[in-house]
Curated annotation (Swiss-Prot):
Highest taxon, organism lineage: Bacteria
The gene coding this protein: argH
Keywords tagged on the record: Amino-acid biosynthesis, Arginine biosynthesis, Cytoplasm, Lyase
HAMAP family from the UniProt entry: Arg_succ_lyase
Family recorded in the similarity comment: Belongs to the lyase 1 family. Argininosuccinate lyase subfamily.
Compartment(s) where it occurs, according to its Swiss-Prot or TrEMBL record: Cytoplasm
Organism: Deinococcus geothermalis (strain DSM 11300 / CIP 105573 / AG-3a)
Pfam families hit by this protein: ASL_C2, Lyase_1
Entry's Gene Ontology molecular function annotations: argininosuccinate lyase activity
Protein name: Argininosuccinate lyase
Length: 465
């Protein structure tokens, strides 16, 4: 990227002094908004075609401008375009390059258009495409989770379910996997819903009030793949809620991926030992030869913070900006780019890592059996026998306390101890409350019983097909 001030600014007619060098550096956005170059040129091609269709430009003028824009696009794709800081942004870089290439007729491209609607349409195009791309990547990860759930259903692998990170009740590993698949289904829906709401073209709104030129906004909207033009020109150029909605969906997805990461990190530790992450997605230590660090999961967890920050940053930018365009809105893009890039790679990594993760069913089953995970089942046994549940809860709570104080499990208690707590209890009853039976008993809709989880998997596969 070069930095020269030899050219007159395309907006410089009103000014008698050159722009201060530090202001030029501070004002420029081309270092990051050049990423919108393809969208910018697509918008310009749609605009100039419409100017020709409506008779505002002659066929020859349209042809010259189109040929020039296509040449610039080829240079950009080949990496030989000279991005210049003194030309501020992607729009002025492209327009100035067009003028250098085809001469004064390039100035007619901006007829009936402002940089305000130009940047708005570029940014909407990018954000809509990013939302749909992330939706597709989320869908791919959903499919991986569902496939893993189906695989582990074959052996009905049991995992401890937790509340407060303490063993609560036994569940199927497949049930746990399907919980994350359900979260991602909603994430995918949020991106698709956001893309549908932002499917309106602001091109033709001009600076803020529309234009007296006889343009056809419906034609440019259709040419760019939008469903319709924005209904209000002021809203079209002055609103960034489409970017906020995208970042909100990104933040919620990042939170879900962070929760998954946290559990994978915990479960891969020596203390848990539930799973082994693949060597291909872990790293070692420069000093401790035994270490196998879950860097992918840790970075996915850590990067959630920057995605949250991108949402809060843009909310803070737009909350105090009066209609319509303000230079503050230059700050809307980097957070969107960053969140998209961050989540794109995390989703791809997880889709690759999860099928290679090895679960240790013997360890997870043993862990599920500890911590009095079938205590609720014992209380339910009493309740089914006619004991009020609150009374049953208290009885079993006392037994848990006794077993805990004496270093035993519920099934280790004697007949005498159990009958002393309640005459309906016995050692035979306690021993019958296995983690397998506990899991099988949870047959309510959405529960962890194998037949219920199979229903969840079947429904998810049907939704993905």
């Amino acid at each position: 990227m070069t930095n020269t001030t030899q050219d007159k600014k395309l907006w410089g007619g009103r000014f008698a002094e050159a722009t201060d060098g530090l202001v030029e550096l501070f004002n420029a956005s081309v270092a990051f908004d050049q990423r919108l170059a393809e969208q910018d040129i697509r918008g310009s091609l749609a605009h100039v075609a419409m100017l020709g269709q409506t008779g505002i430009l002659t066929p020859d003028e349209v042809a010259q401008i189109e040929e020039g824009l296509q040449g610039i696009l080829a240079d950009i794709r080949a990496g030989r375009f000279d991005w210049r800081l003194d030309r501020e942004d992607v729009h002025m870089n492209v327009e100035a390059a067009l003028r250098d290439r085809i001469g004064p007729v390039a100035g007619k491209l901006h007829t009936a258009r402002s940089r305000n609607d130009q940047v708005a349409v570029d940014f909407r195009l990018f954000t809509k495409e990013a939302a749909l791309d992330l939706a597709a990547k989320v869908r791919a990860l959903r499919a991986v989770l569902v496939a893993e759930a189906e695989k582990h259903l074959q052996d009905e692998v049991i995992l401890p379910g937790y509340t407060h990170l303490q063993v609560a009740q036994p569940i199927l590993l497949s049930h746990w996997l399907m919980a994350y698949a359900a979260m991602l289904e909603r994430d995918e829906g949020r991106f698709r819903d956001a893309a549908e709401r932002m499917d309106e073209s602001p091109l033709g709104s001009s600076a803020l009030a529309g234009t007296p030129w006889p343009i056809d906004r419906f034609a440019t909207a259709a040419a760019l793949g939008f469903a319709r033009p924005t209904a209000n020109s002021l809203d079209g150029v002055g609103s960034r809620d489409f970017a906020l909605e995208f970042l909100s969906a990104c933040a919620i997805l990042a939170a879900h991926l962070s929760r998954l990461s946290e559990e994978l990190i915990l479960y891969s530790t020596f203390e848990f030992g539930f799973l082994t992450l693949p060597d291909s997605h872990t790293t070692g230590s420069s000093i401790m030869p035994q270490k196998k660090n879950p860097d992918v999961a840790e970075l996915a967890r850590g990067k959630a913070g920057r995605v949250f920050g991108n949402l809060m940053g843009l909310l803070t930018v737009v909350k105090g900006t009066p209609l319509a365009y303000n230079k503050d809105l230059q700050e809307d893009k980097e957070g969107v780019f960053d969140s998209y890039d961050t989540l794109s790679i995390v989703l791809r990594l997880y889709a690759d890592m999860l099928p290679k993760t090895v679960w240790h069913a013997d360890v997870t089953k043993l862990a599920a059996a500890r911590g009095f995970s079938t205590a609720t089942d014992l209380a339910d046994f009493l309740a089914r026998s006619g004991v009020p549940f609150r009374e049953a809860h208290e009885v079993v709570g006392r037994l848990v306390g006794l077993a805990s104080r004496t270093g035993r499990q519920l099934w280790d208690l004697t007949d005498e101890e159990l009958r002393a707590a309640h005459p309906l209890l016995s050692a035979e009853v306690a021993r019958a409350l296995t983690v397998e039976e506990s899991v099988k008993s949870r047959r309510s809709y959405g529960g962890t019983a194998p037949e219920r989880v199979r229903e969840q998997v079947a429904a998810a596969k049907a939704a993905l097909s």
